[in-house]
């Protein structure tokens, strides 16, 4: 049943072409916009407070990525969340580097507190730090395993009423109903900058058409990452093939290759 829901979500994104508002970091804007276009969604990188109320009145979801955070961006992010709340839209939070500095940790928690409808997507160390536990990280890179973050994820689900996506060698999608384990992806994927940020952006696209868990996006990126890696000679060509496979992916391939387990 879950696999059928995931494949139907892929078709729905392509049919509905949802608009996804992104407040994201300078490093990955091009990557994430291209990924959203390739899957069939419509991205807009809107950072201005002056237009945010209007944008959120017709957008499908809001993605907030704190990767290049500063004092100018923080109030814009909070205001954007308020506008998403006013319009009943879901917020997808990527707490990049949470735990690496107090600014990142406090900002991530403030956004999580503000959002009425929330998906949190992070690596294990970010999820652990966001929950207030001691994490092992090196800047924005995780040193903790995905399994180690499961307890923290369950805490965040209860604390913020959120769904939590832990990405890593194994992906976990944790909701109040269940925990789903995904074992797709490829070991080359962490060598392309912004791969997690790409997942966060895709999560926004699928949230806009009704998947408020983050499962469909994680399933899709894991499968296309595997297929792309089979053709790639290294990280550079992996990035190119990843976009191609996001564009080419069909329901049958997704269902056949998906490695999913409900825990």
Curated annotation (Swiss-Prot):
Cofactor list: Mg(2+)
InterPro entries referenced in this protein's UniProt entry, alphabetically: Hyethyz_kinase, Ribokinase-like
Transmembrane as UniProt keyword: no
Gene3D superfamilies recorded: 3.40.1190.20
Binding locations of ATP: 121, 167
Catalysis: reaction(s): 5-(2-hydroxyethyl)-4-methylthiazole + ATP = 4-methyl-5-(2-phosphooxyethyl)-thiazole + ADP + H(+)
Enzyme class: transferase
Coiled-coil region: none
GO function term, MF aspect, one: ATP binding
Keywords in alphabetical order: ATP-binding, Kinase, Magnesium, Metal-binding, Nucleotide-binding, Thiamine biosynthesis, Transferase
Enzyme Commission (EC) number: 2.7.1.50
List of residues binding substrate: 45, 194
GO BP terms in the entry: thiamine biosynthetic process; thiamine diphosphate biosynthetic process
Pfam families recorded: HK (PF02110)
Claim: Transmembrane is one of the keywords in the record: no
The organism's place on the tree of life at top rank: Bacteria
Pathway in which this enzyme or protein is active: Cofactor biosynthesis; thiamine diphosphate biosynthesis; 4-methyl-5-(2-phosphoethyl)-thiazole from 5-(2-hydroxyethyl)-4-methylthiazole: step 1/1
Sequence similarity: Belongs to the Thz kinase family.
Function field: Catalyzes the phosphorylation of the hydroxyl group of 4-methyl-5-beta-hydroxyethylthiazole (THZ).
Stated name of the protein: Hydroxyethylthiazole kinase
Organism (species): Vibrio parahaemolyticus serotype O3:K6 (strain RIMD 2210633)
Gene: thiM
């Amino acid at each position: 049943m879950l696999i059928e829901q995931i494949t139907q979500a892929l078709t729905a994104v392509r049919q509905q072409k949802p608009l996804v508002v992104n407040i994201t970091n300078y490093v990955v804007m091009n990557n994430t916009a291209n990924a959203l276009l390739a899957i069939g969604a419509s991205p807009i990188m809107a950072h201005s407070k002056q237009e945010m109320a209007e944008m959120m009145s017709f957008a499908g979801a809001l993605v907030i990525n704190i990767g290049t955070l500063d004092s100018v961006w923080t109030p814009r992010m909070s205001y954007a969340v308020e506008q998403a709340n006013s319009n009943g839209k879901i917020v997808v939070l990527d707490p990049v580097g949470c735990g690496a500095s107090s600014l990142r940790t406090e900002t991530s928690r403030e956004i999580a507190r503000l959002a009425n409808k929330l998906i949190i997507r992070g690596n294990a160390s970010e999820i652990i730090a966001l929950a207030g536990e001691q994490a092992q990280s090196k800047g924005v890179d995780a040193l903790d395993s995905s399994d180690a973050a499961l307890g923290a994820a369950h805490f965040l689900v209860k604390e913020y009423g959120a769904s939590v996506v832990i990405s890593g060698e194994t992906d976990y999608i944790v909701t109040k109903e269940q925990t789903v384990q995904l074992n797709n992806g490829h070991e080359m994927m962490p060598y392309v900058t912004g791969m997690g940020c790409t997942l966060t952006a895709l999560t926004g696209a699928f949230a806009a058409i009704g998947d408020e868990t983050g499962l469909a996006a994680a399933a899709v990126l894991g499968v296309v990452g595997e297929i792309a890696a089979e053709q790639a000679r290294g990280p550079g060509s992996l990035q190119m093939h990843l976009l191609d496979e996001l564009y080419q992916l069909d329901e049958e391939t997704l269902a056949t290759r998906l490695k999913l387990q409900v825990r």
